[in-house]
Amino acid sequence: AEDSILLGIEDVTERRILEREKDELLRQKDVMLEELQHRVANSLQIIAGIILMKAARVESEETRAHLQDAHKRVMSIAAVQAQLHASGAVGPIDVVPYLSKLCSTLATSMINDNRTITIKVVGEGGMATPREAESIGLIATELVMNAIKHAFPTDQADGRIVIAYEVDGPNWKLSVADNGCGRPDGTFAQTKTGLGTGIVKALAQQLGAKVETLADPEGTTVSITHATFLTRENRAA
């Protein structure tokens, strides 16, 4: 019997062209994203600079304080954007390391040499989309800024702020606790309807989470709970 050889020929030219086009589109997307991130960062710096100049020129102390608060909020948004940019901000974000770097930046920029306040981040891990991570970061930033400003009105020797992030499947809980001045009765505090509270509530609503505040003589804890999250203690009950 004669040996026979069956040859199959496939023209892959079109496939390779499509692959090259896909790679080029991905490259262009990365370049555009990089450019957009730089534009956002530059815009935030410009806005922050304008606010700071306005604050230096006004005569009203109340107006100056409001402008300084606005400047800090713009800079906090810039810090969140910078951390997301540093982490790539394309795929899922590891939340705890992201919050740790963010809070380290906040501590450096907001706590002066005359105040002994430490900021610590603890957690079990957990991943989030870049958009979710951005909102979580902004909430944590707002709550940390609020604690630095209001929880320690005097030069407390051992001021502490602890940011905890727990996960349970798709659900999570973010809490920011301080050991500053709280409420003597230990009841849930009704948060004031200020700009910071409005920002936190709006971001929490976008994430499908609820906000709870508990203040007692030992300090204040604000919790942002997503869906049906249960703490370890409640899961064990």
Q: Language-model segments: what does each one mean?
A:
Residues 158-170:
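Short beta-strand/loop element within the Bergerat-fold HATPase_c
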Residues 68-75, 79, 92-109:
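Short beta-to-alpha transition helix within the HATPase_c
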Residues 171-197:
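Glycine-rich/acidic phosphate-handling loop/turn and adjacent ATP-lid/helix
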Residues 10-24, 230:
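PAS-associated C-terminal cap
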Residues 21, 27-33, 37, 59, ...:
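Conserved short strand/loop->alpha-helix "switch" segment adjacent to the catalytic nucleotide/phosphoryl-transfer site
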Residues 207-216:
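Glycine-rich ATP-binding loops of the HATPase_c
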Residues 2-11:
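PAS-family sensory domains
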